[in-house]
């Protein structure tokens, strides 16, 4: 779910939206750089990468609740529904989902840094040190563009810019599905968001629905070089 600004600051370290180990650096030719690029770039990025997304009944984690959560990656695809019918079932699903976030070597999300992770921190009482670990290993195109370009956009606009399929609904639609207890449809919607975020993240060059002020040309996140943003 793409939401508003987080209700609280949950990490103190400077973050760009790109995990430190994958951020462009000034120096080149290091041993780490050579190891990371011994495999085709997209295949190497796929290893250990897990996309995640949540759906909620609203934007305020103090008064609203998580209704669905999904993860998607290489060999991983799970949907968790929080129906409020059994506290024991919800607790098991909650711990399973959080454990997957803990275990993943790398995470990706769309607006997960500003919405999903802070929401989980507050709504579920997840300790700050635990969520900080997720933040520091999350690739978040939305966050990178917010901090680096002072630009924001919807997931659908990002998907369109990269020639990927569009989402089937919106966050408001997900709220309606939860209120009407259409759990299968809600789970499918959340999984679609998660899968599309994963596919967008794997692009060698992630085209952004943002134009350069100087040249009015499209800006991309270049995953094949050590340049984060460049004009296409």
Segments and roles (model prediction):
Residues 61, 113, 148, 186-193:
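Aromatic-acidic/polar surface patches that form glycan- and anion
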């Amino acid at each position: 779910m793409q939401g508003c600004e987080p209700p609280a600051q949950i990490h103190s370290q400077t973050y760009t939206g790109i995990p430190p180990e994958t951020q462009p650096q000034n120096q080149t030719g290091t041993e780490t750089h050579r190891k990371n690029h011994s495999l085709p770039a997209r295949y190497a990025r796929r290893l250990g990468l897990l996309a995640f997304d949540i759906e909620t009944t609203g934007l305020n984690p103090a008064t609203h609740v998580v209704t669905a959560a999904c993860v998607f990656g290489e060999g991983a695809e799970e949907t968790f529904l929080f129906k409020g019918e059994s506290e024991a079932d919800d607790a098991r699903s909650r711990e399973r989902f959080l454990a997957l976030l803990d275990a993943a070597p790398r995470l990706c999300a769309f607006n997960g840094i500003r919405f999903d992770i802070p929401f989980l921190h507050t709504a579920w009482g997840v300790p700050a040190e635990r969520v900080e670990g997720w933040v520091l290993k999350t690739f978040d195109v939305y966050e990178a563009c917010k901090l680096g370009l002072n630009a924001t956009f919807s997931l659908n606009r990002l998907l369109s810019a990269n020639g990927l399929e569009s989402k089937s609904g919106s966050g408001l639609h997900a709220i309606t599905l939860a209120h009407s207890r259409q759990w299968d449809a809600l789970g499918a919607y959340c999984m679609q968001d998660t899968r599309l975020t994963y596919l967008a993240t794997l692009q060698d060059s992630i085209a952004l629905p943002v134009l350069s002020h100087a040249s009015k040309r499209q800006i991309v996140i270049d995953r094949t070089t050590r340049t984060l943003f460049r004009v296409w």
